[in-house]
Amino acid sequence: MSATEKAGHTFLASLGKTRLRPGGVEATEWLFSQSQLTSNSQVLEVACNMATTAIELVQRYGCTVYAIDMDKTALENARNNVAAKGLENHIHVMAANANILPFADNSFDVVINEAMLTMYADKAKAKLVAEYFRVLKPGGRLLTHDIMFTAQKLGAGEQGQLVEVVKSNVSPMTRQAWRELFLNCGFEQVLQQNGDMSLMSPRGLIRDEGLAGAIKIVFNGLRTSDNRRRFLKMFRFFRSQRHQLNYIACCSVKGK
């Protein structure tokens, strides 16, 4: 598959990017701060990708994580990364469909799902969130990390460019619409943080990947003509829309 055909996160991963979330480490750290995790916690990570977040959770809290994805390459990378850290007893990597989770009701203390809900239409978002609600224990927390409109939806032209840039039917919402999504699915409380997207900004790249990592990504992004066209197209679009698009991190609490 050429650089121009890959999904946005797959293309960035091929350049060496390890933080594939719109708010990078800033948003993920905020989610961690809201998690109330302990070594006894049972965690489900949906769309685990290469298991970067799952590994950090276990290293920090000593919890047990079930890391699921549908992409075979992502699962292979996740298993390799978990094995490299010697964390196979703490992280269980498996293929599973987020719409029909293979877990009983009230199974997890925390469900974490970063940069996935944005990729679905609003009705599909609600179906996924309802499934996360089902498997959470009473008092459990859903931690999500997505893209939001800062004021109103993009114009048709800009929305079309966004879909073209990331090669996915991206469907962000406003801050209030994200809140209402979780409340309407039964959550009792929704805490939120939003900020500048770090995915393609120079400052965000350095913060998320380190200086050497950022240099490597930019070098790989400019190295071939296909990569260069795709990389610059993504960079220019997100830069032009930096005031209209933010990351949003939400901690939604299930009632006891």
What are these regions (language model features)?
Residues 9-23:
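Class I SAM-dependent methyltransferase Rossmann-like catalytic core
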Residues 15, 147-169:
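Short, glycine-/aromatic-enriched active-site segment of Class I SAM-dependent methyltransferases
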Residues 21-39:
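Conserved alpha-helix/loop element of class I SAM-dependent methyltransferases that forms part
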Residues 44, 50-100:
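Class I SAM-dependent methyltransferase SAM/SAH-binding core
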Residues 99-111:
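A short acidic, Gly/Pro-enriched loop at the edge of an enzyme's catalytic core
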Residues 126-141:
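A short glycine-rich, Lys/Arg-flanked "PGG" loop and its adjoining helix->strand segment in the class I
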Residues 170-186:
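Short alpha-helix
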Residues 191-256:
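Conserved Class I S-adenosyl-L-methionine
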